[in-house]
Regions:
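Radical SAM [4Fe-4S] cluster-binding motif and immediate context
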Residues: 29-198, 203-205, 211, 215-218
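Flexible glycine/acidic-rich beta-alpha junction loops that bind and position SAM and/or redox cofactors
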Residues: 63, 113-114, 169, 173-174, ...
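Radical SAM enzyme core and accessory elements
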Residues: 243-248, 253-354
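Glycine-rich beta-alpha junction loops
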Residues: 16-19, 59, 108, 237
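Short, well-ordered beta-to-alpha junction loops that form the rim of enzyme active sites
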Residues: 14-17, 70, 107, 307
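Glycine-rich beta-alpha loop elements in corrinoid/cobalamin-binding modules
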Residues: 1-22, 241
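Basic phosphate/pyrophosphate-binding loop/patch that engages nucleotide-derived ligands
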Residues: 2, 6-7, 218-227
Length: 354
């Protein structure tokens, strides 16, 4: 905790002791918050599946990705809640707020097979008719065919993987403990179980060369062939407090200002400063676009029926994938602009006539 003393000096208390028993913590005091204003607008960290509540099942992450600040904030001690208590909380939200979806916003929501199956069984036993999304990404090691089937039966619909790179050298440099063949096997199991799958990719790591970038490009194309539904390709922007951020700031390659905090939230490479020693922001933006066009072009060429399904869902006002969400948002913006122009023209003619 940081605060100012009576003389106006900044005082920090240092790291607090970790709370080990997460089940002893009270639920968020949503009654003190205008939560219905968000539920009515279908605010969600994932796709629009109706009235969505955010929920945490754990704290921390046992991994140490170099671009993430979790090791510094939470350490690598991973603590999680009893799955039955998590389901109890979901049931209360269903009764109290009539929710239809839950977003598990954990740093690492699904880590062990036993926990996932216990959670699924509890959801099924309670008969809760809510969908579950994992918009923040999760590990693939414990998600096999059996686990994927349990998750789908329990209402899990959107599953996000976070390989970040298709280059073994890059994965080693960023301390990303992921085996790409294992991730692809997990992805296949999730697809066969009926889950809508998404993956996040990062390009533009300062140490990334052309060969590593091409390896990631080929991996993204392989995911398209494997049947991945959607992909997000983002430009490297390390979290403040992370290993990469602190190193680059010491080297003077990151300017610690408001623009960095703002631009790091944007998906467009053109809105960010390039940290890469060779590739400019505009070049990274072009690479980002090339990755996305290649993935979706190949994915829909391989499975053309999916594109028709996306179109039908968008026209029907339903969302099941990130692509549905993207196109629905763009359609709403276009329609809003058209209606604004029409109304502006009508008002202008009315004023002229008056």
């Amino acid at each position: 905790v940081a605060h100012r003393d009576e003389q106006g000096r900044v005082v920090t208390t240092g790291p607090g002791e970790r709370i080990a028993d997460l089940d002893a913590l009270p639920e968020p005091a949503w009654d003190l918050f205008p939560v219905d204003a968000y539920l009515d607008r279908h605010q969600s960290g994932g796709v629009d599946r109706g009235r969505s509540m955010p929920l945490l099942t754990s704290r921390g992450c046992p991994y140490k990705c170099s671009f993430c600040s979790s090791p510094q904030m939470w350490t690598t001690r991973y603590l999680r809640r009893d799955p039955a208590r998590v389901v109890d909380e979901i049931a209360r939200y269903v009764e109290r707020y009539s929710i239809s979806n839950v977003d598990l916003n954990d740093l690492t929501a699904m880590l062990t097979k036993d926990w996932m199956i216990d959670f699924s069984r509890a959801m099924i036993d309670r008969g809760l008719e809510v969908s579950v999304q994992l918009p923040s990404g999760t590990r693939s090691e414990a998600v096999d065919a059996e686990t994927a089937r349990w998750l789908h039966r329990a209402g899990v619909r959107n599953f996000c993987y976070a390989p970040e790179s298709g280059s073994a050298a890059t994965l080693e440099r960023i301390h990303k403990k992921v085996k790409l063949p294992r991730l692809r096997a997990s992805l296949q199991a999730a697809i066969e179980a009926g889950l809508t799958t998404h993956a996040s990719i990062i390009i533009g790591f300062p140490h990334e060369g052309t060969e590593e970038l091409l390896e990631t490009y080929r991996f993204v194309l392989q995911l398209a062939l494997d049947g991945l539904d959607t992909v997000a390709v983002m430009v490297f922007a390390p979290y403040p407090g992370s290993e990469e951020y602190d190193r680059l700031r010491e080297q003077g390659k990151i300017i610690h200002d408001e623009r960095y905090f703002y631009s790091s939230l944007l998906r467009s490479a053109g809105a960010t400063r390039s940290i890469h020693p060779r590739w400019s922001a505009s070049e990274l933006a072009a690479l980002q676009l090339a990755f996305l066009l290649s993935f979706y072009g190949l994915a829909y060429a391989r499975r053309p029926g999916r594109l028709a399904q996306v179109g039908r869902r968008v026209l029907a006002g339903r969302q099941e994938s990130v692509m549905d969400q993207f196109l629905s948002t763009k359609l709403a913006q276009i329609m809003g602009g058209v209606m604004g122009g029409v109304m502006g023209g009508v008002m202008g003619r009315t004023e002229a006539a008056g």
